[in-house]
Amino acid sequence: MAAQEKIPMLIEGQQMLMDELARLHAERPKIIDAIEEARAHGDLSENAEYHAAKERQGQVEAMIGDIEGKLSRALVIDPKTLSGDKVIFGATVHLLDEDDKPVKYQIVGQTEANAKGGRISYNSPLGRALIGRKVDDEIEVSVPSGDRYYLISKIEFI
């Protein structure tokens, strides 16, 4: 059996997953209580509260399994320990768009991505176009709204 692929993530991404895992673990006893309470109402075949609680239990267990799997395969990266002149995972990249408007993105894992928050996945079209590039490189990115062009003006590891 092949080793499972590592999932790169920042320290903040790991903490976000650990916080969500703790929240889900805390929800487990509440769901069990809801199942027991609904079970006490009698006939389970037409007991909507029972079925809703069992469905929620299944959802929570699936989410716990998913998060535990991600954490077990996590390759946690601290961008402050990185350096270099190329865009890599964890880098913060300053760009100029076609209108010379400055934009800044940090290259992160899929679970951490939030484009409006300045964090893009290394697997996103822009993330893939940036990886391995240097300052003053021009890149073209095909997105659903059309092609976009950027100039890399600065690379930081913060």
Swiss-Prot record:
It comes from Zymomonas mobilis subsp. mobilis (strain ATCC 31821 / ZM4 / CP4). Belongs to the GreA/GreB family. HAMAP family: GreA_GreB (MF_00105). One of its GO terms (molecular function) is RNA polymerase binding. GO terms for biological process: DNA-templated transcription elongation; regulation of DNA-templated transcription elongation. Gene3D superfamilies: Transcription elongation factor, GreA/GreB, C-terminal domain (3.10.50.30), Transcription elongation factor, GreA/GreB, N-terminal domain (1.10.287.180). Coiled coil: none annotated. The keyword Phosphoprotein does not apply. The keyword Transcription applies. This is Transcription elongation factor GreA. Necessary for efficient RNA polymerase transcription elongation past template-encoded arresting sites. The arresting sites in DNA have the property of trapping a certain fraction of elongating RNA polymerases that pass through, resulting in locked ternary complexes. Cleavage of the nascent transcript by cleavage factors such as GreA or GreB allows the resumption of elongation from the new 3'terminus. GreA releases sequences of 2 to 3 nucleotides. It holds the Pfam family GreA_GreB.
